[in-house]
């Protein structure tokens, strides 16, 4: 067995991870968390909440996992949320084209076009791994699970592919909650769904998974000089910039640069201080949950792999023994893409009024409608046209003026309908106005965390094999069971003292496990395998002097302390 197989074996035996629907043969892309896995995952999430809700001052929302078609049409997911697919001509099995290629030849397929993938398959004579048959042409496959709302399937919908859209949809409410004072942030933690083509990477590639996403709304002019950046500018990180990835003369090691975030921003490797700051927050979080620092790097997306909404994006990648570097966190500058997309498609104003330091005189466009003609032409929709024209930006207004001057029709698209605007419908003039502020559409910095991948990496990075034992060397904050409590033997009242001590731990909010089965060495081994940092043994000495033995997991050091002080001692260590 390789390391991955050993870890999966341990996690199944000890109640961390189980195959879903196992008694029915299981389905690829689904895993259950057992009792200890569920606690571990919750500990990872609670640490994440500490960083974003307590430390950063974000607030959490909770929105539906079913999203109407129009929401994901507006967000771009209907058109863009796809993977390359190949289907076998013989057995009709489907596979991810890029994954099939990477499994057969040493090549990075990230960002390759469908034609390039097709060429690689043909040139290298890649066949179906199941039956050896030839593949059909590479095509695209939308990864969203389709569903419908209500009887009859009349209202099309999808299971959400990300939690972020729920935050963007509620932006007006969130902004009101923060009294419309930028910057501010909202987070959401919950299930997301991706109908993966052929998930063959165990817990790494799931069809149903947990995301923790933070959306930080900021005036785009404040991204370059971000106040909080000063506190992290000297943090040195391993970075894999886009230009280095494309430089074939560099070795894998040479492509990684270790530099401070301050230098990375100064040298235009990272786009700006705001995104660099949240790269630092990500690093701190990953260290807090026990990720091995030597197995962490930050990789910049290449232009041809950038998401449809992103201006810059960095992945926190974690190294795994079987699958190599895997993306676990994406920190993206989503610009104003999402808010503008939902403004356009919903007709709602998702801008924020930003006050100037002092009022100033500016030139603005004013529109006077020919109400008689507009009312006659558009009837009940005339009001929609008027409001939509008033919302036009200066750039759009100049485009309108230029079009009408050429005696052409200007097509104004709104969420309700499209309007053909003619020159005779309106008069546009420039006027000077004294204003105290302006409306802007905020930009969004989004750190998006794949909780399941991160949780697996916490397990793998904690997994250790020594001559006589296997252990999970979790950091104390995420260990599912904090303390094992043992009576050396079940007589002379030792078991009763140990049982009472276990209950005392639990009353103090510490998960403790009582174990009186087998030799004491076997009990230590069981606790080591589930990552319990401390064991407390009640023995003959306890009956004499009211002390107990504490054994530390990593060092295996043993020492005695008074029984009545053991709970406080463990609490302090945790």
Curated annotation (Swiss-Prot):
GO molecular function: ATP binding; glycine-tRNA ligase activity; protein dimerization activity
Alphabetical list of PROSITE patterns matching this protein: AA_TRNA_LIGASE_II
Any one Gene Ontology cellular component term annotated for this protein: cytoplasm
Catalysed conversion reaction: tRNA(Gly) + glycine + ATP = glycyl-tRNA(Gly) + AMP + diphosphate
Predominant subcellular localization, coarse grouping: cytoplasm
SUPFAM superfamilies in UniProt: Class II aaRS ABD-related, Class II aaRS and biotin synthetases
Lineage: superkingdom: Archaea
Keywords for this protein: Aminoacyl-tRNA synthetase, ATP-binding, Cytoplasm, Ligase, Nucleotide-binding, Protein biosynthesis
GO BP terms: glycyl-tRNA aminoacylation
UniProt xrefs under PANTHER family: GLYCINE--TRNA LIGASE, GLYCYL-TRNA SYNTHETASE/DNA POLYMERASE SUBUNIT GAMMA-2
Similarity comment: Belongs to the class-II aminoacyl-tRNA synthetase family.
Biological role: Catalyzes the attachment of glycine to tRNA(Gly).
Full protein name: Glycine--tRNA ligase
């Amino acid at each position: 067995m390789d390391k991955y197989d050993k870890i999966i074996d341990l996690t199944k035996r000890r109640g961390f991870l189980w195959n879903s629907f196992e008694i029915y043969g299981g389905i690829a892309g689904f895993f259950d968390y057992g009792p200890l896995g569920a606690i571990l995952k919750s500990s990872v999430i609670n640490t994440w909440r500490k960083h974003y809700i307590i430390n950063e001052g974000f607030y959490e929302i909770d929105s539906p996992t079913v999203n109407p078609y129009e929401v994901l049409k507006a967000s771009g997911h209907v058109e863009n949320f796809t993977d390359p697919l190949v289907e076998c001509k013989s057995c009709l099995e489907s596979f991810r084209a890029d994954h099939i290629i990477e499994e057969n030849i040493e090549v990075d397929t990230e960002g390759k076009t469908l034609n390039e993938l097709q060429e690689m398959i043909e040139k290298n004579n890649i066949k179906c791994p199941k039956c050896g048959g030839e593949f059909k042409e590479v095509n695209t496959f939308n990864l969203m699970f389709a569903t419908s709302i209500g009887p009859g399937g009349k209202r099309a919908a999808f299971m959400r592919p990300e939690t972020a859209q729920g935050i963007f949809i509620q932006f007006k409410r969130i902004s009101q909650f923060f009294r419309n004072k930028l910057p501010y942030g909202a987070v959401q933690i919950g299930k997301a769904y991706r109908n993966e083509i052929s998930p063959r990477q165990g817990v790494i590639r799931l069809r149903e998974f947990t995301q923790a996403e933070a959306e930080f709304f900021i005036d785009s002019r404040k991204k370059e000089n971000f106040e909080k950046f000063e506190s992290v500018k000297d943090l040195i990180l391993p970075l894999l910039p886009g230009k280095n990835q494309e430089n074939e003369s560099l070795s894998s090691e040479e492509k990684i640069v270790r530099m401070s975030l301050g230098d990375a921003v100064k040298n235009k490797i990272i786009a700006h201080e705001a995104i660099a700051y949240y790269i630092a927050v990500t690093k701190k979080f990953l260290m807090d949950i026990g990720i091995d620092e030597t197995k962490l790097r930050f990789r910049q997306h290449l232009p041809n792999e950038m998401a449809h909404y992103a201006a810059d994006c960095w992945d926190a990648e974690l190294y795994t023994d079987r699958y190599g570097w895997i993306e676990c966190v994406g920190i993206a500058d989503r610009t104003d893409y999402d808010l503008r997309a939902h403004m356009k498609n919903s007709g709602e104003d998702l801008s924020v009024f930003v006050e100037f330091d002092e009022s100033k005189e500016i030139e603005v466009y004013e529109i006077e409608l020919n109400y008689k003609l507009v009312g006659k032409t558009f009837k009940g929709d005339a009001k929609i046209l008027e409001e939509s024209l008033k919302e036009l930006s200066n750039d759009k207004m100049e485009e309108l003026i230029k079009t009408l001057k050429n005696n052409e029709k200007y097509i104004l698209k709104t969420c309700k309908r499209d309007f053909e605007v003619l020159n005779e419908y309106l008069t546009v003039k420039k006027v000077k106005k004294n204003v105290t502020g302006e409306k802007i559409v905020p930009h969004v910095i989004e750190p998006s965390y794949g909780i399941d991948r991160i949780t697996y990496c916490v397990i793998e990075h904690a997994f250790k094999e020594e001559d006589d034992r296997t252990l999970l060397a979790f950091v104390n904050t995420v260990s599912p069971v904090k303390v094992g409590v043992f009576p050396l033997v079940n007589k002379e009242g030792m078991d009763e003292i140990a049982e009472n001590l276990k209950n005392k731990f639990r009353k103090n909010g510490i998960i403790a496990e009582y174990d009186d089965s087998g030799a004491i060495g076997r009990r230590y081994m069981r606790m080591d395998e589930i990552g319990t940092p401390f064991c407390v043994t009640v023995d003959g000495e306890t009956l004499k002097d009211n002390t107990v033995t504490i054994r530390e997991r990593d060092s295996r050091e043993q020492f005695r302390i008074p029984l009545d002080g053991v709970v406080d001692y463990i609490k302090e260590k945790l």
